[in-house]
C-alpha cells in the first residue's frame, strides 16, 4: 500500500512516501530535503541532477532500503542521507556524489560510473566521501 504525506514544517514542505513506485521524471533535477522514502521503488527513474539532502531511504522497522536499480543517477547528489540496504544495481551514475551518508549493505553491482568518449577511451567520475560503506557490494563495477 502506497501512502503520501506532506508535512508543513515552517518554510519547507517535508515529503514522506511509503511503498510508492516513483514515476520516471518525478524528481528529475529537483532539490529534495529532509524527506522520507520507505520501501520506495525508484527503478528506472531519471534522477539526473537531483539533490537529496538529509533524506531517509532506509526503513529501520522493516530493515529494507529503496530500489534504485537501472535508475539514471547522472550528477545526482546524496548528502547526509541514509541509503543503507539500497539497491543500486545497474545504475548509470556518472558524476554521482554520495557525501556524509550511511550506505551500509548497499548493492552497487553492475553500476556504471563511466562515459565512453571513443571506442577505446572512457571517462569515469564518482565522488563517495565520508560515507559508511560497510558490507556494500561493488562487484562488476
What are these regions (language model features)?
Residues 1-141:
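Tandem repeat scaffolds
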